[in-house]
Amino acid sequence: MRVEPIRIETDTTPLDGLWYEPDGDIRGVVQLFHGNTMNFYVGPPRFLPPVLTDRGFACLAYNRRGHDVASNRDSRDLEGGAYQTAAEMIEDNVLAHRWILDRGLDDPILVGHSNGGTLAARHAADHPGIPALVLLSAHRGGKDLMRMIAAHGLMAGDRYEEITAHARALVAAGRGRELMLVPGWWYVISAGTYCEYLDNIPDLLDCAARITCPTLYLRGDEEPVEIYPAEEFVRRSPAAVDFELIDDCGHYYLANEDRVATMVAGWLEAVVGL
C-alpha cells in the first residue's frame, strides 16, 4: 500500500486527506466520508483502507470543512464541525469526487459513516454514475433529526425547545457564528450550524428513492432504529439493498473494526464484480 498526503482546494478552507493506492493495479476507487466531529484519520476512514487496498481498491480519505468540533490551521480563525453548513458538506464531497476523476479514474464507490453516510446517500442520489454505496450507520437526516437525537440525550437533550429558540434568535440577530454550549454531543456548536441541522440536512429516506446503485447498509445492534432507519431505507430504495445488523456493536464499531472492514470488502468484490 502506498499513501500520499493530498489537499483539495475549495473557495474557502482546503480539504486535507490521504490517498491510498494498492501495490498492484487499481481495480476500483473508494471515496470515504467521515462522520460528524470526526476526520480522515479516525473511524472507518482509518481502518478501512488497509483492508480495501489489499483487495485492489484505492481509497480517498479526506476532511470536509466540517471536520472535528473546532480547529485552526494557519491563523487564529476557527473552522470545523461547529461552523459547517449543509451546502459546504455537499460541495466538499463533489470536489473530492472531481479530484478522483481528475486523476483519470472512474466514478468512485461511496462509503460513509454516520453523517458521512447520509451525505454519501445524497451524493449517490445526485450522481447516477456511482457504482455502489456503503452506509455505515447512516442517520435519517431531515427535519426531525435534531428532535430525535435530543430525545436520546445528544445535542440539546432535554433542553431542546430552549436551545432551539436561543439558536434561532442568535441567527436572526446576525450572530450565527456565536458558539453555544449544549448538554450533549457535540457539546459546542455555533448557532448557525445548529439551525443548519434543523433545516437543511439531507433526508436519507428521500435520497433512498433516487439511488440507483446497489447499497450495503450496516448498523450496530446497540443503535436506535428510529435514528438509523436501515429497514425503511430498504423499503424505499428502487435498487438492491443488503442490510446487515452487527451483534454487540455500537455506533463507532469499537472492537468490530476488522469484522466490518472484511464485510465491506467482501461485499464490494461481490457486487461490483471485481
Kindly give the residue locations of the regions a language model identified:
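Short beta-strand/loop motif that positions the catalytic acidic residue
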Residues: 211, 217-219
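Alpha/beta-hydrolase active-site loop
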Residues: 80-102
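Short beta-strand element of the alpha/beta-hydrolase
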Residues: 27-35
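N-terminal cap/lid segment of alpha/beta-hydrolase-fold proteins
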Residues: 1-24
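Catalytic histidine-centered segment of alpha/beta-hydrolase-like enzymes
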Residues: 249-259
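Short alpha-helix in the alpha/beta-hydrolase fold that links the catalytic acid
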Residues: 45, 213, 226-235
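Conserved alpha/beta-hydrolase
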Residues: 49-75
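The serine-hydrolase catalytic nucleophile loop
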Residues: 37-49, 228-229
